[in-house]
């Protein structure tokens, strides 16, 4: 198994800070998301899957990052969104339907984000379905360790199901219905900064059909996720060149439009030094 890069360790610290702060504000005292994070952070099987997914994506297929940094960045994005929505009084689907807690939603979203691209160990086409197949037993094992009592069978089932929905739905190829899964979809689309395209661009290769994704992503300087002005969430995409609009219009917006959380956010994008364009 590869050693962790400085970037991966930096993202891990951000996740630690985010999940700790989110759960510190809860009166229930439920620390399941924090216990989950320390389990997943040190899970060698998950680390191996994430590392090999990147080997296949970058080395074999010539695509951008689909490995540990990407999956953990998606987790960061999702936690930021959950925190902002929760602070704004927006309930998750589990909360609204009175079948789960906020901690359950956070747990499911973390599981989904950290495993959503595990199917890239097999290939690009249909990888969201392969991710579901690969992730199911891992999720079941982890939840059984953290919630071992028989009285938790329903809770484990609900968390696992929401996580699976987020994993299988992250490409917008399959309908999803929960806010939690919708957050995964958008969080995945928000990982589009130039760092994600850096390694593939440094590898000599002949021009291919998917190059626009690498070059457009390389123009994205920053993605901001913050509290919105007239909606709870605001996403701002800052870029150095107009080619970055491809990422916004062809990758992120279709994911937002397929998300049950689409009415909860504003989307802005623009070239640095110019006026921002509001899309949503």
List where the protein language model places each region.
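Short N-terminal signal/transit or membrane-insertion segments
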Residues: 27-52, 150-170
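Divalent metal-dependent phosphate-bond-processing catalytic cores, especially two-metal-ion Mg2+/Mn2+ enzymes
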Residues: 1-41, 60-65, 76-103, 115, ...
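An N-terminal, globular interaction/scaffold subdomain
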Residues: 45-51, 63-68, 72
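General structural signal for secondary-structure boundaries
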Residues: 67, 100-105, 152-155
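Histidine- and acidic-residue-rich, metal-dependent catalytic cores
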Residues: 71, 75-82, 109, 128-173, ...
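Active-site-adjacent bridging/hinge elements
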Residues: 44-55, 104-112
